[in-house]
Amino acid sequence: MYAKLVFRNAKRSVKDYLVYIVTMTICVTLFYAFLSISSSYYSPDIGSEYDFTLLSDGMKIAICMITLLLLFLIRFVNHYMLRRKQKEFAVQSIMGMEQKTIGRIFFAETLIMGMFSILIGIFCGVFCSQFITAMLLTAYGEPYEISWTLFPDTVLLTVIFFVVSFFVVGVFNTRTIKKTKIIDMLSAEKENEPELKKSRFIPVVVILFLMFTLWELFSGIQNVRFYYDSRFVFPVKIMYWGNILLPVVTLGWAALWMLKKKKIAFQKLIDGLLICSVLHAFLAASVPALTNQYYLPLHGGILNQYLVFVLIDLLFFICALIYLASSLIVAWKVKSPEHRYKGENLFFFGQIISKLNTTSKTMTLICITLVLAIFMFIAAPILTGWSSGYLDIRSMYDVQVYSRYNDVYEEENLPQDSYEIITDFLTEHKIDTVYDCTFNLYLSEKDDFHNRQKYDFPIVAISLSDYNTIREMLGYEQISLEEDEFTTQWKAIATEEERDSFLKEHTSIMTDAGELTLSGQSYYEDPIGETAYNSYTNVLYVLPDNICEKLLPVIKNRYITTTENISYENARKLEKLFTEKYPEQAETGAIYGVRFSTLQINSSIANNFILQTAMIYGAVVLMVICLTVLSLQQLLDAGQYKYRFSVLRKLGAEEKHIGKLILQQLSVWFGLPIITAIIVAAVVIAYFIQTISAEISAYIGFSTLMLQIGATMGILVILLICYFISTWIIFRRSVNP
C-alpha cells in the first residue's frame, strides 16, 4: 500500500520536484562528465611520450573532493522540498499516519526523483564528456574525434556517490519530520530567518574587522619605519602614510561610537566603517602597483600581506553593504515620494525590504561564494596560461642538463663534467641527435665568485660561439661581435623598464680580460631557456670567445635536440641514471639537474589540465549552489506571495503590472548579490593580475587573457540567464490564480 502511495505522490508532485530534478540532473551531469576521463576504460591516443596515469589519478581525487560541496546543495534542495510539503505532512499526521512513516515515504519520493535525475544526468554527462575530452586532446596537441562511450566504472562511482548522498540526507530528513510538531508543520511557511539587525552576525563581523584594522595599522607603521624614504614621489608617500592614517581614522570612528553610542545609531557606525573599508581596499591594492612602477623595496611577504588586507576590507564591504541595503531602500523610499507612490512601487518596496531584513545573512554568504566562484573562473585560464607559457621556456630542448654553483666555495669544486652518461644512453637506445651543445657560463670578474647575496648574484657570460650554436638549435639568426664588444640576452620575464635601466647603466663592463663596450645591437630577447642564466638574474652577457678563454667558468650545461621525441619510459630511465651519478646536491656543493621535454610536457599538461578542470568544475558547482539558493529563497515563499498578489489583483492591479512587479523583484533579488560580487571580484582580480603582470606579459599576453576572461564571463552570463528565466517561469506559475 505504501509503495503505491509513494509512486502516486511522486507522479502527482512532479511539478513540485521540478527544481529538485533539474538541480540534481546538473550535479550528476557535471560529476560524470568531469570524472569520465579518469575511467580505467578511457584510453585516448596521446602517443608514447605521454603517461596518462598521473592525470587520471589526479582528476579522480580533485573532482571527488570538490563534489563534496554538492552534499550541501543536495541538503538545501531537500530542505526546500521538506518546507514545501509541510502542510501535506501535517494533514497526513492528523489523519493518523505516524510521522516516522511520513518521513520514510518522503525519503522514498526523493529517492525516486533522485534516481530519475541520475539516469538523465548520466545520459547528459555522456554528451558533456565530449567537451572535456576535446579540452584534453587539445592540451596534448592531438586531433579530436567524437566517440560515444559509457564507462562502467564511472557510472558505478556516480551512482554510488549520489545514492549514498540521498541516503545520508534522507536519514536527516526522516529525523526532522519525526521530531517536528504538527503545529510547526502548519506554520512552517510563515517562518523566516531572524532579522540581521537582531542577530549577532554583524557585531561579530565589526569586532573582527576592527581587530584586522589594528593589524593593518601596525603593518603600516612597520613598513614606514623600515622602508620609507623622504625622496619617494608623492603617490608613494600617500600609499605609505595612507596605510597608517586610514586605520587610525577607522579605529577612531569606532572609539567615538563607543563613547556616544546612545546618540549615534549602530547603523551610522556601519556607514563610517563601510566608507573606510572601501578607501583602505584601494590603498592596499595600490601597494603592488606602486612597488612594480617605482621598484620599491617591498618583498613578496609584504605584498601577500596586503592582499590579505584587501580581501578583509572587501569581505567587510560585502557584509556591511548587504546589512545596509534595506536601510538604503527605506531612505530612498522616504525621500522620494514621487517614486514611492508611483504605480505599485509601494508594494514592491515592501516586498524587497521585508525579504532583505530576514535573509541578509544568506545573501551575504551567497555574495562571498559568488566572488570565490568568479575568481576561480578568471584565475583558471590565467594560472594555466602562465604555466603553459612557462613550459615553452622550460622545455625548449629534448634533453637539458644544467648546474649551479650556489653552494660551491672552492674553485676546484666547480662543475666541469661533460655528462657523458647522456651520450652513452642515447647511443645504446639508438636515439639520434640533431644538435648537441656542451658549454660553460663564465664570471666576467673572478672576484664575483664569492658574491652570494640573494637577488645580487653576479651576471654570468656565454661565449659567442656557444651562443650562436644555441641560436642555431632554436632556428634563430646568428649574431656577430667585435673583439672589444659585448651584448646581452634577456629572459622573457624581464620588463622593458628593467632592461632599459640596466643598459643605460652598463654601456661598458670590466672583465678579467679587459674592458668591453656595449654593441650597437645591445640586447636580444629570443627565448633560449631559463637555465642559461645565473640564479636570481634576468640577463646574460654574450662575450667574444677570446675573452671567455681568460674568465672563470662556474656553470657547465648541455643542451640536446633529438630527431624523434624520447619516449616517456626512456626519459624516466635516463633521469634515474643521471640522478644516481649526479645527485641534486653533490658533496662538492654543486647542484645538478636534468630536464627532458617529454617529462616536462607530460607533467605540466597533466597538472595544468587537473588545475583548470578542478577550478572550472569548482566554480560551476559554487555558481550552481548560489543560483539555486537564490532561486529557492524566492520559491520557498511562493505561498505567501500568491496571497499577496491575489490581494493586489483584488485591488485592481492589471496582470501586465503584476508581471512587471515580479520581474523587478527577481531582478533586485538576483542583481544585488551578483553585482556586488562582480564589483568585489573585479578588485580582487585586478590586484591578482597586477602582482603577476610581468608573468602575464611574458607567458600569456594581455590580449589572450582578455579573450579568456571574455569567454569565462560568457559562461557566467549563460548560467545566470538560465536560472533567472527558470525562476521567473516557476514563480509566475506559483502566484497565478
Regions found by a protein language model. Give the residues of each.
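Peri-transmembrane interface segments
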Residues: K15-V22, A33-M65, Y80-R83, Y228-N243, ...
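Conserved transmembrane alpha-helices of multi-pass membrane proteins
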Residues: Y50-L68, Y140-V168, E195-F209, V233-L246, ...
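Selective transmembrane-helix segments that form parts of the transport pathway or gating/packing helices
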Residues: V14-Y20, F106-C124, V159, V163, ...
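Alpha-helical transmembrane segments
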Residues: T29-I61, M135, A325, V371-Y397, ...
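Small-residue-rich transmembrane alpha-helices
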Residues: T29-S40, F76-Y80, M113-E142, D153-K179, ...
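Interfacial "coupling" helices/loops that link adjacent transmembrane helices in transporter permeases
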Residues: L5-D16, I26, F72-I112, E189-E195, ...
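Basic-flanked hydrophobic alpha-helices used for secretion and membrane insertion
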Residues: Y390-V624, G701
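N-terminal Sec/SRP start-transfer signal
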Residues: M1-V28, L196-R200, W257-C276, L324-L370, ...
